[in-house]
């Protein structure tokens, strides 16, 4: 992970690339009533939402300054705690205008004990229970931004870990500021035309498989390689990347793993030749959906998907994805793919959503329409600044409620703090990609790594919760608490 100053420079440099790459798709789509065609980013830049560690904007959200809070010294402070993550440049503090009023966003940790600091904002990948700011002050909320894979921090997948936070912004629709569709810029992205059938037929005649697998992140909690390895016994799979590789991408530039998650035109042209894409997420959580799902649909391929158990809720219609878990075995899945590969009429039914009026899922349409943040859209805030304002508005409401209660306790109740719930991550214990966990040897690398990591996250969450309840001030005591919890669990 890059050092803090480098990451801040990346934040600034990314602003221009985000704006430059976003001018065609979503804006044109709104002007044409949602029916515009998607235009690829002119420079082949990566399609992804502005990363918390990469490209973010610095535009302020609009809002009307509230009377009596004009001076920055009177405004509530939001303290970004994760090193290098601060969606403003330059300086350490920035006044932000939000819907309910103004706050001051800061990254200066010296503000931690200031009475005006009302909220700490944490980035989930960086959050470490052993380094949490203690003691936790009663007047401060903790806010969590975690749009990335749960494998980065399994502490957050357990009740004791997620309930440390008051406000959340995660991939789950149940979080306070949901980012479920962070990888989907709009409906126009899904409507990209399907490649000519003759082009794909020629590709097959040249000996290529019907099914593509492109992964370089191996040995993940979802254990996807174990399933794909078994599937390969029943149907040809062209596997690129570092995982189960049996073919190489045509150029060294495309072989670079940094290119594999981009909208590079040459890469997209190559991938679009395949009728089916194996799309397996690195972890299984409700609403956790990445480019592995949306990019094949963009390219006119059928995703063969395993990931979010709730994925059907988000699909453009009820016949646009093949779900691995609908089949009792890899062999049965292979037989079905082979059937579709040989029956164009049945295959094309999976791409009907690309036709005018083909996107019939009103929940998907409404979710895209009503989200207040955009994906590479200069007319909308990115989700970092959006969540920041969400926290600001919450703190302003909390301040008003506290003042009202102080002035008239009988008429205004005590403000009840909001507490995050396990559904805000919703990630169960990892299971094998194929077979039963009891059948896997104890020295299997997946079993040794991910099962242990998952349950250690529970212990860490319980340890930090106990430290907060005991009003501990020394972070070094965390390991004593963790050891005590571990020993108690061993004797259960």
UniProtKB/Swiss-Prot annotation:
Belongs to the glycosyltransferase 10 family. The keyword ATP-binding does not apply. Keywords: Disulfide bond, Endoplasmic reticulum, Glycoprotein, Glycosyltransferase, Membrane, Signal-anchor, Transferase, Transmembrane, Transmembrane helix. Glycans are attached at residues 166, 443. Residues 25-492 are lumenal. Its EC number is 2.4.1.221, 2.4.1.-. This is GDP-fucose protein O-fucosyltransferase 4. It comes from Homo sapiens. The lineage of its organism: Eukaryota, Metazoa, Chordata, Craniata, Vertebrata. GO terms for biological process: fucosylation; N-glycan fucosylation; positive regulation of protein secretion.
């Amino acid at each position: 992970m890059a050092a803090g100053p480098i990451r801040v420079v990346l934040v600034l440099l990314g602003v221009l690339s985000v704006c430059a790459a976003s001018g065609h798709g979503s804006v044109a789509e709104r002007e044409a009533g949602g029916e515009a065609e998607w235009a690829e980013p002119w420079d082949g830049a990566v399609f992804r939402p502005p990363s918390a560690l990469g490209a973010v904007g610095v535009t302020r959200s609009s809002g009307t300054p509230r009377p009596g809070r004009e001076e920055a010294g009177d405004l509530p402070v939001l303290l970004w705690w994760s090193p290098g993550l601060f969606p403003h440049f330059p300086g350490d503090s920035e006044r932000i205008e939000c819907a309910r009023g103004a706050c001051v966003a800061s990254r200066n940790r010296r503000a931690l004990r200031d009475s005006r600091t009302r909220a700490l904002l944490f980035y989930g990948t960086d959050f470490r229970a052993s380094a949490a700011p203690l003691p936790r002050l009663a007047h401060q909320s903790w806010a969590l931004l975690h749009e990335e894979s749960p494998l980065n921090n399994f502490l957050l997948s357990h009740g004791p870990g997620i309930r440390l936070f008051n406000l959340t912004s995660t991939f789950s629709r149940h979080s306070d500021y949901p980012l479920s569709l962070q990888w989907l810029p709009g409906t126009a992205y899904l409507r990209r035309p399907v490649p000519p059938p003759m082009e794909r037929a020629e590709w097959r005649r040249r000996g290529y498989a019907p099914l593509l697998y492109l992964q370089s992140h191996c040995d993940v909690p979802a254990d996807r390689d174990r399933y794909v390895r078994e599937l390969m016994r029943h149907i040809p799979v062209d596997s690129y990347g570092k995982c189960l590789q049996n073919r190489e991408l045509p150029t060294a530039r495309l072989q670079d793993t940094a290119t594999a998650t981009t909208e590079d035109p040459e890469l997209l042209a190559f991938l679009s030749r395949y009728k089916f894409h194996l799309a397996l997420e690195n972890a299984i959580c409700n609403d956790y959906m990445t480019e592995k799902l949306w990019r094949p649909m963009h390219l006119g391929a059928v995703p063969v998907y395993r990931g979010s158990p709730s994925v059907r809720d988000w699909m453009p219609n009820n016949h646009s994805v093949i779900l691995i878990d609908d089949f009792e075995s890899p062999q049965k899945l292979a037989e079905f793919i082979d059937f579709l590969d040989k029956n164009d009429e049945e295959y094309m039914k999976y791409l009907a959503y690309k036709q005018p009026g083909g996107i019939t899922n009103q929940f998907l349409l409404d979710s895209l329409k009503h989200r207040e943040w955009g994906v590479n859209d200069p007319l909308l805030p990115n989700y970092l600044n959006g969540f920041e304002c969400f926290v600001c508005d919450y703190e302003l409401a909390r301040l008003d409620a506290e003042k009202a209660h102080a002035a008239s306790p009988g008429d205004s109740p005590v403000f009840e703090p909001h507490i995050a719930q396990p559904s805000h991550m919703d990630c169960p214990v990892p299971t094998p990609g194929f077979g039963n966990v009891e059948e896997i040897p104890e020295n299997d690398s997946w079993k040794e790594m991910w099962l242990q990591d998952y349950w250690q996250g529970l212990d860490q969450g319980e340890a930090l919760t106990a430290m907060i309840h005991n009003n501990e001030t020394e972070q070094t005591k965390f390991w004593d608490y963790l050891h005590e919890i571990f020993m108690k669990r061993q004797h259960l």
